From Swiss-Prot:
<feature type="binding site">
    <location>
        <position position="280"/>
    </location>
    <ligand>
        <name>L-serine</name>
    </ligand>
</feature>
<comment type="similarity">
    <text>Belongs to the class-II aminoacyl-tRNA synthetase family. Type-1 seryl-tRNA synthetase subfamily.</text>
</comment>
<feature type="binding site">
    <location>
        <begin position="344"/>
        <end position="347"/>
    </location>
    <ligand>
        <name>ATP</name>
    </ligand>
</feature>
<keyword id="KW-0067">ATP-binding</keyword>
<protein>
    <recommendedName>
        <fullName>Serine--tRNA ligase</fullName>
        <ecNumber>6.1.1.11</ecNumber>
    </recommendedName>
</protein>
<dbReference type="GO" id="GO:0005524">
    <property type="term" value="F:ATP binding"/>
</dbReference>
<comment type="pathway">
    <text>Aminoacyl-tRNA biosynthesis; selenocysteinyl-tRNA(Sec) biosynthesis; L-seryl-tRNA(Sec) from L-serine and tRNA(Sec): step 1/1.</text>
</comment>
<keyword id="KW-0648">Protein biosynthesis</keyword>
<dbReference type="GO" id="GO:0016260">
    <property type="term" value="P:selenocysteine biosynthetic process"/>
</dbReference>
<dbReference type="InterPro" id="IPR042103">
    <property type="entry name" value="SerRS_1_N_sf"/>
</dbReference>
<keyword id="KW-0963">Cytoplasm</keyword>
<dbReference type="Pfam" id="PF02403">
    <property type="entry name" value="Seryl_tRNA_N"/>
</dbReference>
<comment type="subunit">
    <text>Homodimer. The tRNA molecule binds across the dimer.</text>
</comment>
<keyword id="KW-0547">Nucleotide-binding</keyword>
<dbReference type="InterPro" id="IPR033729">
    <property type="entry name" value="SerRS_core"/>
</dbReference>
<keyword id="KW-0436">Ligase</keyword>
<comment type="function">
    <text>Catalyzes the attachment of serine to tRNA(Ser). Is also able to aminoacylate tRNA(Sec) with serine, to form the misacylated tRNA L-seryl-tRNA(Sec), which will be further converted into selenocysteinyl-tRNA(Sec).</text>
</comment>
């Protein structure tokens, strides 16, 4: 939710942002018009309440013979106040509804859609194989790491089991991420995976992509697609202390996505699935600190990717590919040899005050006045990483070398095919 004062003062900036996102700039003018109507409705209601108060004093001072006529006038005024307050409530709800439709203001992201990102950096060189590399599923099955057939039997398409060393590899990766997060000052959390509608809406996930979210109608609850949602809701309607710097959490949770718009895409293996595990970083900070915190989250992701030894690139995501809450987003994408392309492993987003305003998460400034906090998020490890780890570290004999940083968790240097 964007600041109405910012909208009034900078309507062209918000219109340009809408165009950059590929969204309707007319929504800006619709909201400005609704905001003006709301302000007029407030003024009318305030004036009538003031008149009603003055009229009440007049009745109290009136003589007995004048009071009946004045009481009749008071009843008429009371009806007008009630009508004006109803009009004010309607006008305020209209503004709120339009505010909830308007995406965050893009800050520095390139224009365009999904394919218009800008590559900021390449790290590591894609490996040249002197044998025909296997894809992650073939490797996962031959090494006894992934069981898609039984996952499908038990739960349907896009479900799987991680078995044996596959389970240990993921647990090791996520544990390493948790260790790195706590060493960097993040408080680890295992948050709920079911949240109320107001929390899901507060994070900006109930817009155009709400079909991606699992909804439990009987309980009126949503399954999270990222622990960002529960971590953002943690301080809803609170004033938090940011005097000693940003408040930082890292959530370890299972995540659930319907993949409603992905029919036929990535149907093989665990690249695009309905359930996966993830360690997600989440930061609350003062708005002026958000850009620096965004850079730090990206550095955390780079450090973790270096530990798992995969070549990757960093992209500046285009405005048309941003989620509603993000003002800017950087993705890291790892090289997947059998696909001959880079695939997303992490995202880190600067959501400025968009989520904080929706969830009413505030801090006190140097004058003690409550202000809206900024929020940021970033992936530190997730199930999908196994794809890049397996494919980039495979050997001609079908084995996979375990990245050195993960060996203490897996208990092996090399994963051998199951005989």
């Amino acid at each position: 939710m964007i600041d109405l004062k910012f909208l009034r003062d900078n309507p062209d900036v918000v219109r340009t942002s809408q165009i950059t996102r590929g969204e309707d700039p007319a929504l800006v003018d619709e909201l400005l018009s609704a905001d003006e109507a709301r302000r007029q409705a407030i003024q009318v209601a305030d004036e009538l309440r003031s008149e009603q108060k003055a009229f009440g004093k007049k009745i109290g001072q009136a003589s007995p013979e004048d009071r009946p006529a004045l009481l009749e006038g008071s009843n008429e005024l009371k009806a007008k106040v009630k009508e004006a307050e109803a009009a004010q409530e309607t006008a305020e709800q209209r503004v709120h509804d339009l505010q909830m439709k308007l995406s965050n203001v893009v800050e520095g992201a390139p224009a365009g859609g999904e394919d218009d990102f800008v590559v900021l950096e390449h790290v590591g060189e894609p490996r040249t194989f002197d044998f025909e590399p296997k894809d992650h599923l073939e490797l996962g099955e031959s090494l006894g790491l992934i069981d898609m057939k039984r996952g499908t039997k038990v739960s349907g398409a896009r479900f799987y089991y991680l078995t044996g060393d596959g389970a240990m590899l993921q647990l090791g990766m996520l544990t390493l991420a948790a260790q790195k997060a706590t060493a960097a000052g993040f408080t680890m959390m295992i948050p709920p995976v079911l949240v109320r509608p107001e929390i899901m809406a507060g994070t900006g996930f109930l817009g155009d992509h709400s079909e991606e979210i699992y909804y439990l109608e009987r309980d009126d609850m949503y399954l999270v697609g990222t622990s960002e949602v529960a971590l953002a809701g943690y301080h809803k309607d609170e004033i938090i202390d940011l005097n000693n710097g940003p408040v930082k959490y890292a959530g370890w949770s299972s995540c659930f996505r319907r993949e409603a718009g992905s029919y036929g895409k990535d149907t093989r293996g665990i690249l695009r699935v309905h359930q996966f595990d993830k360690v997600e970083m989440f930061v609350y900070c003062k708005p002026e600190e958000a850009e620096e915190q965004h850079r730090r989250l990206l550095e955390m992701e780079k450090d973790m990717l270096a530990a798992v030894e995969v070549p990757y690139r960093i992209i500046d995501v285009a405005g048309g590919d941003l989620g509603a809450s993000a003002a800017r987003k950087f993705d890291t994408e790892a090289w997947v040899p059998t696909q001959g392309t880079y695939r997303e492993l992490t995202s880190t987003s600067n959501c400025t005050t968009f989520q904080g305003r929706r969830l009413q998460t505030r801090y006190r400034d140097e004058n003690g006045k409550p202000q809206i906090a900024a929020t940021l998020n970033g992936t530190l490890a997730t199930t999908r990483w196994l794809v890049a780890i397996l494919e980039n570290n495979q050997q001609a004999d079908g084995s996979v070398i375990v990245p050195e940083a993960l060996r203490p968790f897996v208990g092996k240097d090399v994963l051998e095919p199951v005989k």
